[in-house]
């Protein structure tokens, strides 16, 4: 945040552990820190809050912030179900407050170029999209990534990136979503899932996400006139454009800091 121009200062930090909050504040030269959510939202000097608590706390934490007139940037997944999301958006709209899911990949410079390529019809009509993301999650089965009580599982943890990418490409919601394969662990969360998404224009997309296997974070968009391949769609610095009858073109957009600066 301190390296990004024309943004407000980050003057406060909240941590439920007082010692860790103090240590973080001192390390990053933050003058104030809080040990409770209530103390934070009641501070009139706070304009906006970044919520990065466990998944199942997002709804209640965001709601508390909105109730006290704070703008909100909430980490992904925004909530764990649609009902909660709709309630928060309605609250923010009624109170004229800003609220957004913090899916930082939406703001990467390469995706501005990708949108432009697609809007210009360079690869024609999009027919098929595929993306995958996987890694081997470590830790005890009671940890957040495996715990259904904490909103764990592959879909909510990393599948959000896949779905965010599909939204960038299509610009709309799918007409139908089908789970073609899923593995549920002993905690009731998905270690692996494969989704098939169908859109009104006939485009079909496939999304694979797993926290039990290493998968390259690549994606491919197939059109009637060509294709686009992204070797890493999450960090999105490079895409390879192949148009029928032409040599492949590599397009690169490196980030300035770590990628999060564009979201801010």
Q: Across the structure, where does each feature detected by a protein language model lie?
A:
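N-terminal Rossmann-like dinucleotide-binding module
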Residues: 1-28
């Amino acid at each position: 945040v301190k390296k990004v121009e024309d943004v407000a200062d980050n003057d406060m930090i909240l941590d439920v552990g007082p010692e860790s909050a103090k240590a973080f504040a001192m390390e990053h030269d933050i003058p104030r820190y809080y040990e409770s959510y209530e103390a934070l939202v009641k501070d009139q000097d706070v304009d906006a809050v970044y919520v990065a608590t466990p998944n199942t706390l997002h709804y209640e934490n965001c709601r508390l912030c909105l109730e006290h007139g704070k703008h909100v940037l909430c980490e992904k997944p925004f909530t764990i179900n649609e009902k909660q999301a709709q309630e928060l958006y309605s609250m923010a709209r009624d109170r004229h407050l800003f609220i957004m899911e913090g899916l930082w990949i939406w703001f990467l410079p390469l995706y501005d170029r990708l949108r432009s390529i697609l809007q210009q019809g360079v690869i024609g009509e999009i027919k098929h999209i595929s993306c995958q993301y996987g890694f081997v999650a470590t830790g005890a089965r009671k940890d957040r990534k495996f715990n259904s009580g904490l909103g764990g599982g592959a879909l909510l943890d990393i599948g959000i990136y896949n779905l965010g990418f599909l939204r960038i490409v299509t610009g709309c919601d799918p007409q139908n979503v089908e789970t073609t394969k899923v593995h549920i662990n002993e905690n009731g969360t998905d270690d692996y899932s494969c989704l098939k998404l169908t859109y009104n224009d006939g485009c079909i997309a496939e999304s694979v996400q797993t926290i039990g296997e290493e998968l390259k974070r690549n994606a491919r968009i197939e059109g009637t006139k060509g294709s686009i391949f992204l070797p890493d769609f999450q960090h999105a610095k490079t895409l390879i454009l192949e148009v029928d009858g032409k040599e492949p073109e590599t397009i690169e957009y490196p980030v300035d800091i770590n990628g999060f600066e564009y979201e801010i």
